[in-house]
Amino acid sequence: MTTLSFHHVTVLMDEAVQGLNIRPGGIYVDCTLGGAGHSSLIASKLTEGGRLIAIDQDDWALDNARERLASYMDRVTLVKSNFRHIKDIVKDLGLSGVDGVLFDLGVSSPQLDEGERGFSYNADAPLDMRMDQQAPLSAYDIINEWDEEEIAKIIWLYGEEKFSRRIARQIVQQRKKQPIQTTGELVELIKEGIPAAARRTGPHPAKRTFQAIRIAVNDELDAFKEAVVDAIEVLNPEGRVSVITFHSLEDRICKQIYQDFSKGCTCPPAFPICTCGNKAVVKVITRKPILPSEEELEANKRARSAKLRVAEKL
């Protein structure tokens, strides 16, 4: 993919950046640079005294950002890394804290649409799915080396696919004959594992399984949990974290972390004084998630599952 072909429609862009309550001289972190939509908007709101740190582990995204953010590079620092390292990144840059952190957990459209990366079930390509091309674990490794129980487990947990065991069985039976090399081969095996009646309704039959394998390859959920907790830790008082999720697993994690960090005293009401010592760390700004507008949904069908949650450091 060339830099110019990296075209990605950013979801909930205005709402997520508004949620950060940008101050022109503040320090902000975009943990998911992607197509640089959010980063471009944040950078445009900063003065020369402000700073944006934009993180991505995908070389394509970073190359694209160097062009898209060229006029703002006096206030932008690009970092190739996984966002789970946000605390170390902030520390290594000599910063004591930041004023806002943004996460957009959607996979960039170019990654989905370009078959060569192995993310898409609509194109035949080598099984890969690595966001970081230097990472050791690929989709090929999972599909051809993990045991049947492990494969079924991740498809169930990360894809919420009720036919996970049948799909895992098809995969293991086929790889006994020869290795499964491509996404096209995997799609056919997934279809064979799902009853015909179930294949005729709902989304593409491979959607949930591909999501599950991608999450496992990139350790997305554990990385996200670590990153949100650490993002809250590095926030300055009144700093905000904006999180856009695209499926229920991510949204539940975000909601639970916000709830846990917003809890104050947990002593029984009858206690005359607090003995637990618990203090709220954040206040939740969005009691209910912000959803895309009808106009955005009409323009971008991939926005339909997006949810935005915002919290503020106390």
From Swiss-Prot:
Catalytic activity line of the entry: cytidine(1402) in 16S rRNA + S-adenosyl-L-methionine = N(4)-methylcytidine(1402) in 16S rRNA + S-adenosyl-L-homocysteine + H(+)
E.C. numbers: 2.1.1.199
Residues reported in the UniProt entry to bind S-adenosyl-L-methionine: 36-38, 56, 83, 104, 111
Subcellular location: Cytoplasm
Pfam families for this protein: Methyltransf_5 (PF01795)
Protein keywords: Cytoplasm, Methyltransferase, rRNA processing, S-adenosyl-L-methionine, Transferase
GO MF annotation terms: rRNA (cytosine-N4-)-methyltransferase activity
Any one GO BP annotation for this protein: rRNA base methylation
Presence of keyword Plastid: no
The keyword Disulfide bond is assigned to this record: no
Enzyme class (EC, first level): transferase
An example Gene Ontology CC term for this record: cytoplasm
HAMAP family registered for this protein in UniProt: 16SrRNA_methyltr_H
Protein name: Ribosomal RNA small subunit methyltransferase H
